[in-house]
Amino acid sequence: FIDNQNNFGSQSYKGELGKIGTYKFSKLEELNQINFKPLFFSNNIVFFDKKGSIIKYDENQKVKWKKNHYSKAEKKLHPKLNFISHGENILVSDTIAKYYSINGNTGELNWSKNNTYPFNSEIKKHKNKFFVIDYKNTLRCYKIEDGSECWNLQTEDSFTISNSKYSLIIIGDMVVFSNSIGDITAVDIESGLIIWQLPTQSSSIINESYN
């Protein structure tokens, strides 16, 4: 499975596709623009539907539990969810600025918090912390235990909202991430201080893009 450096490792593929089962859930909006992955959790699969309900399927494609931790108004926003497992718990971030932790065995809520802006990256974790980027090009570090913020680092903002997820990896004691204008930034994983930053576009190209 994918690691903290977005590396899937070596894969073996024989060129054959075989149907092994069907997983049913309500149709997601804007399916062609979705870049979200199911979570493989203890021989089970965890995914979400268009109202933000989290569904856990067993290896026989049967629903083990289905839980929704959104209000009626939030469900109408069709939140899209990112997952990462941590022991028996699952950490979740979404596209309507919520992030929370649930028990992976029952689906019950451990804690839930709100960010100022929606999230637009996968979740990465390191020891007792996890990391995610929001639409304001801000990398945020939270405690896994209760979701409290350890630190945040805002990089240069843009005038548009990206349809593509920002990249985020962990290398040793660094968190390396990209933002909507193409800057790549490495920060210290404990303090959140910038170690180095690499712009991938000249300022003239960026200005032309938004004029």
How would you label these PLM feature ranges?
Residues 183-188, 197-199:
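Surface loops at the rim/top face of extracytoplasmic beta-rich domains
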Residues 1-34, 58, 62-75, 108-115, ...:
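Aromatic (tryptophan-biased) beta-strands that constitute blades/sheets of beta-rich domains
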Residues 98, 107-108:
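A structural signal for beta-strand and strand-to-loop patches characteristic of beta-rich domains
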Residues 31-51, 76-98, 113, 117-139, ...:
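Repeat-blade elements of multi-bladed beta-propeller folds
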Residues 56-57, 101, 141, 186:
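Conserved blade-register residue in beta-propeller folds
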Residues 58-59, 104, 144, 189:
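Inter-blade boundary loops/turns of WD-repeat beta-propellers
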